[in-house]
A protein has these predicted regions:
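Alpha-helical transmembrane segments and their immediate juxtamembrane cytosolic regions
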Residues: 1-278
Length: 278
């Protein structure tokens, strides 16, 4: 039976992701990728940027967790090969072919500033097109990560062919479930703390493969269990309260800083809102 709450939670989260990017595009807190704010901080505080501090720590981990839950339910119905074939068709194909057919338009807007500075002067049109296509990768990193995790999941499932680990996770009490948040804290430390300019460090920090693999596997092995969902459903109000308090504390103590920096993401408060926010 399809669980519509997963679909509802997913589309609401996607809308919040879009809302976040509207705010982020005009932020003045030093977050890379936007076009800049209405003036320098702190002369122009731009309090609407609070949205970035509240939403960024948890919405992408939540989407990966939901993807892990959905993968569990799908693999209960289909064999691994059929499921992965469908994943490849729905994820990898749009992330490659779609990059050159549609996302060059996103790349065009990403390169407007560079064009105004004369960076593309003398460069042939087909080369510009290639640059725009690659720079337009944008949200495709999510489905590229998801495809990779789907491949890894098939390998991991062979280690737990009889679902013993999955069944053990379903017996976890509330305290162990909350302590799983420590894994997020450890996952954030896999980021490159001081990314080097003109290297792949920034790209790695964007994809965060190790960090995002954690909620994906949590969704598959832990949160897909009906027993776990029932336990958390009974205490959702206190958990939501903890998330709200953590979010307020994080915003008050870090407002004005780059909320996407590895140092900020690895802070205990960030990890708390990351876990409780889901």
């Amino acid at each position: 039976m399809r669980k519509h709450w997963i679909d509802n939670l997913r589309w609401v989260t996607v809308l919040l992701v879009l809302f976040y990017h509207v705010i982020y595009f005009y932020n003045n807190k030093g977050v890379f990728g936007g076009i800049g704010g209405f003036g320098p901080y702190p002369e122009y505080p731009q309090y609407q940027d609070v949205v970035m501090y509240i939403l960024y720590p948890w919405f992408m981990p939540l989407l990966f967790l939901l993807a892990g839950i959905s993968a569990r339910y799908a693999l209960d119905k289909y064999d691994g090969k059929s499921w992965f074939r469908a994943r490849t068709r729905k994820l990898l194909v749009p992330a490659t072919i779609g990059l050159f057919v549609f996302h060059w338009m996103v790349g065009y807007f990403n390169t407007v500033v560079a064009s105004r500075q004369g960076v593309f002067e003398g460069i042939p049109g087909f080369v510009k097109y290639g640059i725009m296509a690659v720079s337009g990768i944008g949200p495709l990193w999510f489905i590229q990560d998801l495809w990779l995790f789907s491949l890894l999941l098939l390998l991991i499932r062979k280690l737990d062919a009889k679902d013993r680990f999955y069944q053990a996770c379903g017996k976890l009490g509330l305290a162990p479930l909350i302590l799983l948040g420590i894994l997020f804290f450890l996952g954030e430390y896999t980021l490159v703390r001081q990314p080097r300019p003109e290297s792949l460090d920034g790209l790695y920090n964007l994809y965060k493969p190790v960090f995002y693999l954690i909620p994906f596997l949590m969704g598959y092995f832990v949160f897909a269990n009906d027993a776990v969902q029932e336990k958390l459903g009974k205490v959702w109000i206190p958990l939501l309260g903890c998330a709200a308090v953590s979010g307020i504390a994080l915003t008050v103590t870090t407002f004005g800083q780059d909320n996407t920096s590895p140092q900020n993401l690895a802070s205990p408060l960030n990890c708390l809102i990351n876990f409780f926010g889901r």
